[in-house]
């Protein structure tokens, strides 16, 4: 399984919001509002297509929960099969993940830290690691 191991604040700047979990004053998004890459291209950007906007929102959700594409696709397939609005079902499934629950309860500062707490075995569910 491959996961993103590059600079986390680069993704914050790329998607225009704090995704890395750092405090707002320490995140790269607050220091530099421009997206990463060539600076001369900033004034020449066109309006993104509908597909580009949908892809950007999907990637933003993926990086917010720090999951890989295959996991995200499986969550989407499960959400579509459930009755109701598939987008709401998808967000509900993502919120039910153990690392997100630990993050929401305040046991960790970031979702990455919550994943590390789980993988190191500090959290057990029904006496199972």
What function would you assign to each model-found segment?
Residues 1-105, 129:
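Ferredoxin-like alpha/beta domains used as RNA- or RNAP-binding modules
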Residues 101-104, 109, 116-117:
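Extracellular-facing segments of soluble proteins and assemblies that are Gly/Ser/Thr-biased and enriched
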Residues 111-129:
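A contiguous pocket-lining binding segment that forms or flanks enzyme active sites
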